[in-house]
């Protein structure tokens, strides 16, 4: 039995429409789907005022073909040791996240693996709607660059999600945490490519999905620094038929949201492309998308950096100093040119994510090199004498240019070894920092925007 893709209106229409209008729409949608798929059990009209047992039964029945596990709250208490502080990974806008471990002792057939258990904070920035959005999308979407949802729990007022565990945490943590090991150039391009593939998959699905909240804290990294998109609470179905956009309330994170989306509320796949350009800039510069601790003209990364992306001399000035010049100049120019296109103020001039993938893939072949260093040598003359009559008759400005081809594989292996040694340090930091990873997601809700951090919110 094929699993049909649900929209928000088919699941909780009463959240956004009058009951009569929602019922009419649901009936029409049912007839449409029945004609395509025969007899398929779809969610009845439901809202959160219904008993949770009825809600859980409807949800689990409708997602029966998705292979999601429906966990009990007691089971999740067991695997997290009652949500022990020792297993605490971090906290974000959704709520706290704890590490756990599942195997066939918990449920027959369960693969033994560490997991991240995310608990909805009823007083947090997100709620039932975002929780259900994530369940519905991740139950039906599967790709190497999307985080895997293993199961969920819905008991009384409790809403939990169980994901695969991502040991390297978030890209935000890797780039900006105080004691993080600097990411090598090749690793940064690998992360950019993986995230781009995840977005391209969403945009080119049979029923396209607009991610709407693409940012560094939502890009999680496995042990090999392979990027996976997480947190689908704000995702939306793409426009259908002859529609060019989805009209919606403006939601997202300051510094990442596309300007036309902020101005009009018109959401398209190109909105995600703009956000990707911002993250690519963060990878190039080592700067946050929004940093109010900087001078006013440098606070918004995209506005400050974009004019310099097409000029080689100016580009060198904005590259991340943590790279210490160890990057491919050609690769950096190509990546910067791509970021420039993605950040175009005209949405139609931005590339599709499939084109972004094609541009990024060759950049993995560029090795890490030392950028040119210039050393000025001025000859000294004897006091009261004249300059010697040789090759130094006149003052020279000798430019010594060194280009060292480095073994990128060796450097990455050294970086991974250093990261492994400091993993316990990162784990301790995740427990104590407001920028902690939450399977790993950063606590954007508690960061102070005035101090330069981003904030997930309604964007007015």
From Swiss-Prot:
Localization (cell): Cell membrane
Inducing or repressing factors = Induced by the V.dahliae elicitor EPD1 (AC G2WWH6).
Cellular component terms per the entry's GO annotation? plasma membrane
Q: Does the keyword Cell membrane belong to this entry?
A: yes
* Family membership: Belongs to the protein kinase superfamily. Ser/Thr protein kinase family.
Q: In which tissues is it expressed?
A: Mostly expressed in roots and, to a lesser extent, in leaves.
Gene, per the UniProt record = EIR5D
| Annotated positions binding ATP | 89-97, 118
Effects seen without this gene = In plants missing both EIR5A and EIR5D, enhanced V.dahliae virulence leading to altered accumulation of reactive oxygen species (ROS) and reduced activation of cell death. This phenotype is due to both impaired V.dahliae EPD1 effector-triggered immunity (ETI), associated with cell death, and compromised pathogen-associated molecular patterns (PAMPs)-triggered immunity (PTI), charaterized by ROS production.
Q: Which residues form the Protein kinase domain?
A: 83-364
What does the UniProt function comment say about this protein? Required for pathogen-associated molecular pattern (PAMP, e.g. chitin and flg22)-triggered immunity (PTI) involving reactive oxygen species (ROS) accumulation and triggering plant defense, including defense-related gene expression (e.g. PR1 and LOX). Ensures specific recognition of the EPD1 effector of Verticillium dahliae, resulting in a hypersensitive response known as effector-triggered immunity (ETI), characterized by the activation of programmed cell death to limit infection by the pathogen.
Catalytic site = 213 (proton acceptor)
Class of the enzyme per the UniProt entry, highest EC level:
transferase
Q: Which GO terms describe its molecular function?
A: ATP binding; protein kinase activity
Question: What EC number(s) is this enzyme filed under?
Answer: 2.7.11.1
**Record note on quaternary structure:** Interacts with the V.dahliae elicitor EPD1 (AC G2WWH6).
What domain of life does the native source organism fall in? Eukaryota
The protein, known as: EPD1-interacting receptor-like cytoplasmic serine/threonine-protein kinase 5D
Give the UniProt keywords, A-Z: ATP-binding, Cell membrane, Hypersensitive response elicitation, Kinase, Membrane, Nucleotide-binding, Phosphoprotein, Plant defense, Serine/threonine-protein kinase, Transferase
Q: Which SUPFAM superfamilies match?
A: Protein kinase-like (PK-like)
Q: Which PROSITE patterns match?
A: PROTEIN_KINASE_DOM, PROTEIN_KINASE_ST
* UniProt modified residues of type Phosphotyrosine: 163, 165
Q: How is it modified after translation?
A: Phosphorylated at Tyr-163 and Tyr-165 in the presence of pathogen-associated molecular patterns (PAMPs); this triggers the expression of pathogenesis-related genes.
Q: Which reaction does it catalyse?
A: L-seryl-[protein] + ATP = O-phospho-L-seryl-[protein] + ADP + H(+); L-threonyl-[protein] + ATP = O-phospho-L-threonyl-[protein] + ADP + H(+)
């Amino acid at each position: 039995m094929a699993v049909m893709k649900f929209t928000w209106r088919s699941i909780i229409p009463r959240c956004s429409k009058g009951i009569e209008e929602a019922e009419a729409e649901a009936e029409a949608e049912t007839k449409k789907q029945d004609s395509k798929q025969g007899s398929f059990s779809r969610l009845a009209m439901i809202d959160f005022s219904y008993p949770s047992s009825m809600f859980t039964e409807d949800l689990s029945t409708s997602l029966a073909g998705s292979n999601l596990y429906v966990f009990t709250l007691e089971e999740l208490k067991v695997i997290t040791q009652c949500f022990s502080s020792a297993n605490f990974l971090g906290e974000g806008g959704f709520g706290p996240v704890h590490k756990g471990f599942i195997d066939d002792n918990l449920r027959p057939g369960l693969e033994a693996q560490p997991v991240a258990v995310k608990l909805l904070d009823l007083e947090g920035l997100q709620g039932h709607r975002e929780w259900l959005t994530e369940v519905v999308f991740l139950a039906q979407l599967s790709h190497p660059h999307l985080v895997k949802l293993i199961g969920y729990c819905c008991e009384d007022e409790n809403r939990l999600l169980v994901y695969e565990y991502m040991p390297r945490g978030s890209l935000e943590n890797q780039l900006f945490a105080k004691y993080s090991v600097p990411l090598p150039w090749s690793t940064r391009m690998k992360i950019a490519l993986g995230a781009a593939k995840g977005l391209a998959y969403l945009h080119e699905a049979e029923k396209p999905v607009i991610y709407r909240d693409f940012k560094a804290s939502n890009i999680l990294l496995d042990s090999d620094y392979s990027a996976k998109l997480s947190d689908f609470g704000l995702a939306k179905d793409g426009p259908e038929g002859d529609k060019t956009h989805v009209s919606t309330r403006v939601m997202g994170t300051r510094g990442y949201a596309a300007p036309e989306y902020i101005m009009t509320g018109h959401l398209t796949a190109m909105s995600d492309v703009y956000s990707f350009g911002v993250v690519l800039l963060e990878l190039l510069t080592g700067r946050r998308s929004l940093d109010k601790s900087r001078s006013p003209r440098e606070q918004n990364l995209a506005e400050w950096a974009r004019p310099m992306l097409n000029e080689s001399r100016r580009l060198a000035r904005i590259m991340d100093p943590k790279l210490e010049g160890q990057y491919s100049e050609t690769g950096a120019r190509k990546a910067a040119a791509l970021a420039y296109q993605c950040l175009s103020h005209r949405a139609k001039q931005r590339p599709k994510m499939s084109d972004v993938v094609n541009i990024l893939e060759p950049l993995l072949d560029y090795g890490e090199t030392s950028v040119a260093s210039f050393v000025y040598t001025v000859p000294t003359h004897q006091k009261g004498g004249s300059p010697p009559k040789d090759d130094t008759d006149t003052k020279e400005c000798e430019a010594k240019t060194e280009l060292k081809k480095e073994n990128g594989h060796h450097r990455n292996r050294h970086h991974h070894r250093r990261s492994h040694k400091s993993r316990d340090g990162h784990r301790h930091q995740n427990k104590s920092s407001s920028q902690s990873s939450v399977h790993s997601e950063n606590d954007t809700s508690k960061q102070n925007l005035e101090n330069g951090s981003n904030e997930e919110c309604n964007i007015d």
